[in-house]
Each structure stands twice: as C-alpha cells, then as structure tokens.
Regions:
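Catalytic Walker B motif of ABC-type/P-loop ATPase nucleotide-binding domains
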Residues: 55-58
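H-loop/switch region of ABC-family ATPase nucleotide-binding domains
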Residues: 91-92
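Conserved ABC ATPase "signature" region
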Residues: 9-26
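A short, surface-exposed alpha-helical micro-motif characterized by mixed small hydrophobic
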Residues: 97-99
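Conserved ABC ATPase signature
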Residues: 30-34, 38
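Conserved beta-strand-loop-alpha-helix hinge in the C-terminal portion
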Residues: 110-132
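Conserved catalytic motifs of ABC-family nucleotide-binding domains
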Residues: 51
Length: 142
C-alpha cells in the first residue's frame, strides 16, 4: 500500500516505514480493505519513506475508533521521541491534546494562545475561550 510510485531500491524504506507505524504485517493488503485507523497509519508510513523532519496532520483521528486512536497517538509520540520528527496536528480533542502536547496553539480567527501545553490547561480563562476554537497540537523534539 505504501510502495505505490516507489522503485525497488526503496523497498527497504517502505518496510521500515510500515514497521514504524506497526503495519508491516498488513503490507500486502489493499488500502480499501483497511480500517480508517489503519489507513491513517499507512498515510503516515507513506510520508515517512521520504524521511521528513515535520509531519503536519489535519484532524488525523476523526472517525477512528478509540483503540486505533490511542494506537495512532502512541505512534506519533514514538515518531517524535525516537525518530526526532516534529508533529503538528489540529484537534478538538482536549483529552488527547492535554496528554500529548508539548505546546499548544489556539485559534479562533486569530491566534489567542501559543505556549506550553500545561500553561493552557491550568489557565481557567483560556479554557473558557477554548469553546468553538480550533486547537493545534505540537510535539517538538528539542
């Protein structure tokens, strides 16, 4: 599923990318036969083949079941910590953002907060402003 458009020389990169997102065992399956969460992991693997320094994801777990959602976030955390890949993603899931974010950017037509995740979650005024906003989570490797 990831190797589309890649040469034979890239097969090792494809295998490595699939292992990083825990999809190696399903490498021979068609993308349409995979669950939504599995498909998201394949899309991440496809990006990993090119050795990115940053992944930018828009609501990556929308419609994904709870098990695959947790697995997806665990994979993103590992990519951040082990592979030194910065991950920026948009989310309205405050629980996930609070558990995983190093930094938070909160937008509601303008940027009204950008800083350390815990500062945001400890600020009652910020939490009130959050309603009807778009939040972006950042996992930076420093």
């Amino acid at each position: 599923v990831v190797s589309m458009g890649q040469t034979n020389n890239d097969s090792d990169k494809v295998d490595e990318a699939l292992q990083k997102v825990w999809m190696h065992e399903l490498a021979d399956r068609r993308i349409g036969d995979l669950s939504g969460g599995q498909q998201q992991r394949v899309f991440i693997a496809k990006a990993l083949v090119n050795s990115p320094k940053i992944l930018v994801l828009d609501e990556p777990v929308t419609g994904v079941d709870v098990h695959n959602k947790d697995l997806f976030f665990q994979i993103l955390s590992e990519l951040n910590s082990k592979e030194k890949i910065s991950v920026i993603w948009s989310s309205h899931d405050l629980d996930a953002v609070e558990r995983l974010a190093n930094k938070v950017a909160c937008l509601n037509k303008t940027l009204f907060f950008h800083g350390i995740s815990q500062e945001f979650f400890n600020d009652e005024e910020m939490m009130k402003k959050y309603s009807e906003t778009s939040m972006q989570m950042h996992m930076h490797h420093h």
